[in-house]
Amino acid sequence: MLIPLARAVLALELLGAGAAHAERLKDLASIQGVRGNQLIGYGLVVGLDGSGDQVRQTLFTQQSLTNMLSQLGITVPQGSNMQLKNVAAVMVTATLPSFARPGQTVDVVVSSMGNAKSLRGGTLLMTPLKGADNQVYVIAQGNLLVGGAGASAGGSSVQINQLNGGRISNGAIVERAVPTMYAQDGMVYLEMNNTDFGTTQNAATAINRQFGAGTAMALDGRVIQVRGPLDPSMMPAFMSQVENLQVARAPATAKVIINARTGSVVMNRTVMIEEAAVAHGNLSVIINRQNQVFQPDTPFTEGQTVVVPNTQIEVRQDGGALQRVTTSANLADVVKALNALGATPQDLLAILQAMKTAGALRADLEII
């Protein structure tokens, strides 16, 4: 029986069929110092169709609106209770990309922090976004795009996706640039995305082959030191050539990832299993609850109608037959061997752990 796990693993094998081929260095590593910066701000969304915060329960929304109106020259009488339904307090986040200059735009994500029912159709008012140094780097404003939809009537409601979060494409303008220092005295450091001595050494070898011996040196299993031109104006062209070099990826470490919460099992193509015998019995618990109604036999008496729950619990354990798993070095063969057990992905969690303990699973087992 081909279980859904098998289809997923076979698809991953087909997608990774070319894993042994060369890849661009820019897909395997990043330049040290070239990074984005997280920004955050607090703002107000207006124009909601009665789906905003209930100001009696979210006092910060009313306070924020009063402060904003005061800055615009509008005085709100002290102690007044504004009954507003079209305003919502939100948190706004964005990522300032490297080398961003004033005047450029970035996307922002808007999330409700009160009890608003929906942000659909709202407009974010001018909101400054600050970095970790408490300096303002971008100003966000614009109409929200909310991917969800919902409707309610007569006590019933239907909702598709999330309504309390939205996005504004190019909704923030950069006001301050972040200096990006990635080269000092012509020295650049490349950081591999994954720690692997083989792939790191292959990358250093490819750079030396292109630009001459001594240009690159692997410092450890993740960082490569590259000697570039001393002239800063020549560094962008040099790094462009470095990023587009073809590097052979070393075979990955055999690994099986298990998500105990969802029952997902993912393995790479280097996983091997040794010959073993596996028996796994299925334990099932069935709970059946029915409400029985008892009424008085004769009408017009003092008896009352009583509802009595009747609960039945049944525990069933099916005997597991001993199955032989043959030695397999190919991912497709591993999938076939596991399918022969007739186990569901949830059962495979226990089976793979037992095979690892018995030494039959030649892979690192990681539970997330």
Curated annotation (Swiss-Prot):
Assembles around the rod to form the L-ring and probably protects the motor/basal body from shearing forces during rotation. One of its GO terms (cellular component) is outer membrane-bounded periplasmic space. GO terms for biological process: bacterial-type flagellum-dependent cell motility. HAMAP family: FlgI. The basal body constitutes a major portion of the flagellar organelle and consists of four rings (L,P,S, and M) mounted on a central rod. It is found in: Periplasm; Bacterial flagellum basal body. This is Flagellar P-ring protein. Residues 1-22 form the signal peptide. It comes from the Bacteria. The gene is flgI. Belongs to the FlgI family. Keywords: Bacterial flagellum, Periplasm, Signal. GO terms for molecular function: structural molecule activity. The keyword Signal applies. InterPro entries: Flag_FlgI. Its main location: periplasm.
